[in-house]
């Protein structure tokens, strides 16, 4: 289970060092085989391969005649990239994916349960600012009655 956020730096080759606290779990659960893809929020999603496979299968099962579904399939599946974590716990983020998410040197890796989100640090700060400005009427019905 991945949770919490960590400020990291991409190296000059676009490699991201996965925090040590997650490396053993990733090597044990997927042998370091990871899928990185685009998210509509202009961040990147990072999945262990076994977690990604049913998601990709589900996305492919939707009717592709719907323009909205086809567009989402193109974005998520069309940008999916298989990467392997090296012995130092690094993964290479491709140039097209870095460009899509606007990633600069300083990034934030945010645990989201079974996956991570990778954000440019400035965009992450804006996202968090937005998340803290909800008014009572802005809460989606799915979250009504939910308490932390």
From Swiss-Prot:
Transmembrane domains' residue ranges: none
Keyword terms: Cytoplasm, DNA-binding, Repeat, Transcription, Transcription regulation
GO cellular component terms, semicolon-separated: cytoplasm; nucleoid
Gene3D superfamilies per the UniProt record, alphabetical: Transcriptional regulator MraZ domain
SpoVT-AbrB domain location: 5-51, 80-123
GO molecular function annotation: DNA-binding transcription factor activity; transcription cis-regulatory region binding
Keyword Ligase applies: no
Chief location of this protein within or outside the cell: cytoplasm
Subcellular location: Cytoplasm, Nucleoid
Keyword Translocase in record: no
InterPro entries named among the record's database cross-references: MraZ, MraZ_C, MraZ_dom, MraZ_N, MraZ_sf, SpoVT-AbrB_dom, SpoVT-AbrB_sf
GO biological process, one term: negative regulation of DNA-templated transcription initiation
HAMAP family: MraZ (MF_01008)
Subunit structure: Forms oligomers.
Protein family according to the UniProt entry: Belongs to the MraZ family.
Stated name of the protein: Transcriptional regulator MraZ
Organism: Nitrosomonas europaea (strain ATCC 19718 / CIP 103999 / KCTC 2705 / NBRC 14298)
Lineage, highest ranks first: Bacteria, Pseudomonadati, Pseudomonadota, Betaproteobacteria, Nitrosomonadales
């Amino acid at each position: 289970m991945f949770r919490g956020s960590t400020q990291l730096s991409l190296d000059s080759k676009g490699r991201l060092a996965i925090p040590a606290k997650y490396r053993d779990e990733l090597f044990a659960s997927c042998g370091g085989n990871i899928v990185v893809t685009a998210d509509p929020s202009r961040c990147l999603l990072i999945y262990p391969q076994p977690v990604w496979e049913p998601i990709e299968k589900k996305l492919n099962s939707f009717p592709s005649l719907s323009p909205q579904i086809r567009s989402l399939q193109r974005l998520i599946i069309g940008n999916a990239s298989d990467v392997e974590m090296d012995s130092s716990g690094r993964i290479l983020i491709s140039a097209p994916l870095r460009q899509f998410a606007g990633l600069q040197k300083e990034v934030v890796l945010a645990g989201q349960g079974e996956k991570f989100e990778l954000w440019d640090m400035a965009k992450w700060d804006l996202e968090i600012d937005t998340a803290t400005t909800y008014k009572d009427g802005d809460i989606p019905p799915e979250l009504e009655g939910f308490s932390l």
